[in-house]
Amino acid sequence: MYKLVLIRHGESTWNKENRFTGWVDVDLTEQGRNEAYQAGELLKEAGYTFDIAYTSVLKRAIRTLWHVQDKMDLMYLPVVHSWRLNERHYGALSGLNKAETAAKFGDDQVLVWRRSYDTPPPALEATDERAPFNDPRYAKVPREQLPLTECLKDTVARVLPLWNESIAPAVRAGKQVLIAAHGNSLRALIKYLDGISDSDIVGLNIPNGVPLVYELDENLKPIKHYYLGDQDAIAQAQAAVAKQGKAG
């Protein structure tokens, strides 16, 4: 049996302001930093250790990983930073308040943009300053692979090459792997691992800063998964994530 631990970054400044964030590189709030430290404490108390970690190239995930490593005294851990673990790109919605957007376009439309599998939000213009083309962190990524918007289907297609070519081989080699990433890049990976249908994935909400443990068989198929921590508090956090895109 193998174990894989996933963690969504702690609360970010735009999580707190209820904005669509995507690839915009916002930082953690004080609460987000505390959530990351608490995640590290939970993992340490439960006896976990790691051989390698994966994260995105966005600071809210990177800093979450730092805090977890710090709490676990694993600052020396090898870390792979990959744009493939970035949050889903929210296109022209990036920076907009979710509730205000729902009030303008309707709860149903915003739910489709936030949670449907194959309907992306309106795209950015290529000349928009939020477009990734001139960002140095993506200088080595072929331009045609950089998105101006994404649906979850696109995010799955982006995440899976990293899983197949790097993460899965590390797990099979017996390494203890930690992934610190984002709500939708983790939803994409979970959809693949659990074989969740395109329709059912709409209802999957991942709370900030809570370790999610997957136990996998020899074929890397899930045996079971569970969150570490107070289960009632985790359920409340999941419900809060689900309500973010509603007008009232």
Curated annotation (Swiss-Prot):
EC number(s) recorded for this UniProt protein: 5.4.2.11
GO biological process: gluconeogenesis; glycolytic process
Keyword terms, alphabetized: Gluconeogenesis, Glycolysis, Isomerase
SUPFAM superfamilies the record matches: Phosphoglycerate mutase-like
Active site: 9 (tele-phosphohistidine intermediate), 87 (proton donor/acceptor)
Sites marked Transition state stabilizer: 182
Involved pathway(s): Carbohydrate degradation; glycolysis; pyruvate from D-glyceraldehyde 3-phosphate: step 3/5
Enzyme class: isomerase
Reactions the enzyme catalyzes: (2R)-2-phosphoglycerate = (2R)-3-phosphoglycerate
MF (Gene Ontology): phosphoglycerate mutase activity
Binding, substrate: 8-15, 21-22, 60, 87-90, 98, 114-115, 183-184
Similarity-based family: Belongs to the phosphoglycerate mutase family. BPG-dependent PGAM subfamily.
Cited function: Catalyzes the interconversion of 2-phosphoglycerate and 3-phosphoglycerate.
Quaternary structure note: Homodimer.
Name the UniProt record assigns to this protein: 2,3-bisphosphoglycerate-dependent phosphoglycerate mutase
Gene name per UniProt: gpmA
